[in-house]
């Protein structure tokens, strides 16, 4: 872990920073006034967070001008009507506010309002001009279709 830098938002739990053994870098987030003020005072960029870790990481990757972004495990839907993997403490089924979207195979799949908002945020973000030269691959096995991504098997991405 000492060789892996940690990018964090100003809203991070403070003990994580105290206990992390490697380098840490603050990401100033859009829409959080104190963070925007801090960034302005130090002439630092602000990043779109989109409400999730994935959307924040995507904005960072785009700003870093990464050649390729590969999404893995990004279902953005309820596979078997679960919101977390089997065996975790947070597995639960929800019905209120759910909606149906198309999955990567063109079939209907259930998702939640927040997951669909993340999906739409990602779709809009990868269509912006600063992401035009990048490749976005969805290597998740299933899940909601993210327009603008190419569907590929993870082993193909790794070994090609």
Go through each PLM region and give its residues.
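Metal-ion/cofactor- or nucleotide/acyl-coenzyme-handling active-site neighborhoods
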Residues: 1-160
């Amino acid at each position: 872990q000492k060789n892996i830098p940690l990018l964090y938002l100003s809203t991070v739990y403070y003990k994580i920073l105290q206990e992390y053994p490697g380098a840490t870098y603050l990401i100033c987030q859009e829409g959080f006034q104190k963070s925007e003020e801090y960034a302005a005072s130090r002439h630092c960029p602000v990043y779109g967070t989109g409400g999730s870790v994935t959307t924040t990481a995507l904005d960072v990757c785009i700003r870093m001008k990464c050649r390729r972004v590969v999404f893995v495990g990004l279902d953005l839907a309820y596979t078997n009507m679960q919101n977390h993997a089997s065996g975790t403490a947070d597995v639960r089924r929800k019905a209120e506010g759910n909606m149906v979207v198309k999955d990567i195979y063109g079939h209907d799949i259930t998702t939640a309002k927040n997951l669909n908002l993340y999906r739409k945020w990602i779709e809009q973000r990868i269509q912006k001009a600063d992401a035009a030269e990048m490749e976005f691959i969805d290597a998740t096995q299933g899940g909601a279709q993210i327009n603008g991504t190419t569907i590929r098997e993870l082993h193909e991405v790794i070994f090609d």
